[in-house]
Amino acid sequence: MERARRRGGGGGRGRGGKNVGGSGLSKSRLYPQAQHSHYPHYAASATPNQAGGAAEIQELASKRVDIQKKRFYLDVKQSSRGRFLKIAEVWIGRGRQDNIRKSKLTLSLSVAAELKDCLGDFIEHYAHLGLKGHRQEHGHSKEQGSRRRQKHSAPSPPVSVGSEEHPHSVLKTDYIERDNRKYYLDLKENQRGRFLRIRQTMMRGTGMIGYFGHSLGQEQTIVLPAQGMIEFRDALVQLIEDYGEGDIEERRGGDDDPLELPEGTSFRVDNKRFYFDVGSNKYGIFLKVSEVRPPYRNTITVPFKAWTRFGENFIKYEEEMRKICNSHKEKRMDGRKASGEEQECLD
């Protein structure tokens, strides 16, 4: 039995490789076979669910992204409550005998759209950090070369004191909150490199059931190597473009036509650039205002119902400040005139 299982698992892995065509990004409707072959524990846990209610959850599309030693499977599924995205992270060891580790993350397509926007911010921040890190690494290599030329009695420590005290330094953090769930995004760095951790937590309650039919158990976490954030984001964008509109229409009731939103705009002031982007989700329309000064980015989201008050307050403070500036200018001019008249009298 044990040999038969191993042979079946090996054959499944081979078929999974053929289905995806060996590319880092793939799309296949035969994905459940490849999925079960890569991590059979997932298939074993899903089999009772499928036997009890195979018609409850329908798989619409799937993509696979390979980043270093990890594989990320992005599955768009549909249940009676709507469409959702299931992300599975699979880590495969060097040899066949190594254990296969996996983790997963489940989120609605509306949250996936916000995750896509957040990934854009993290990608931009990571790009600036990369430039900084390259300069620091170049300078650090020079320091190491000079140290090697010097003779010391005691060997140098393998890592710096700062890295020992802070093995995981946080470079950027953000979060998304929806219903009874929170999604924390943390860009971190350790000795192995930089990575993005996406962690989902759920607020528990008596007899509460998760949105996608799962009980509210432990938190879900995936870890994405920073080098693959762009490829992961691109796969997410394509799935949202293909299947996200249906989810939004279902939440609206399917009767209203999608609203045409104004185009975004931006302008530069000194060394800062301000972006104005109008978006919408199941909670309504909002304005996303971003202040960008590399490598920093600050963003606020203003709901549509508060736009009028925001505009009124902006105009109010602009008028008051203009009056204050004009009054100050007039006082300075009067002071100069008075000093000039006094000088004429003295002459």
Swiss-Prot record:
Protein known as: Purine-rich element-binding protein gamma
Cellular localization per UniProt: Nucleus
Gene Ontology BP terms: regulation of transcription by RNA polymerase II
UniProt region (Disordered), positions on chain: 1-34, 133-169
Gene name for this UniProt entry: PURG
Keyword Phosphoprotein: yes
Regions recorded as binding DNA: 51-293
Assigned protein family: Belongs to the PUR DNA-binding protein family.
Domain of life, per lineage: Eukaryota
Pfam family, one: PurA
